[in-house]
Amino acid sequence: SAALIELVSVGAQDVYITGDPQVSFFRQNYKRHTNFAMKPERMDYIGTFGANNEVAIPIRSKGDLMSYIWIESTGIAGVQENATGLFSNAAASPTEFSLWIGGQKVSQLDSLFIQGVHNPLLRDTTAKASMATTTNTRKENNTGNHYMIPFFFGEDWTKVLPLVALQYHDVEIRIKCRDGYIPTDTPKVYGNYIYLDTEERKFFTDNDHE
């Protein structure tokens, strides 16, 4: 048939694009999506937030996936020179955040990068732009009481942390607080857990992840 002739002439790599179209100008299609639920959960941590202190936050398998993590405390998203924020222009070194999986460090950020590079540049939506905290300014919709840790798994739904596939590995975030940091109150750490249906959970447990 003409379709087979076209397939042979174009190549097998084009099967995915032309073989099973999902959109037609002449009929209506309904796309099916998998079911999931989300719930923010408070996370326990080991250590005390304060100047030069180290804090470990174990990521428990309360859900199937983890999308993003943030810290709540009065004035924790400080700008310029301050005492209550994880960043200060007067600090000798910034606060460091590192992600550890199975005893190996897989990602590391610091508050200078977060507020000096990430927040000013990666504002791809109006909502993010109105909440941004940089080294010198805090936008109008940011109260300064929340500090998002922008690890890779919180930026894109396709890169969420598959906790269900890491059940035999210790997963934790380690924080090395900057010098001069004096929290106003006891910080609280939260994580956004995602819960999958049975079929999709099986996909995450049975397949390799890169």
Tell me what each language-model feature is.
Residues 1-210:
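Short, low-complexity Pro/Thr/Gly
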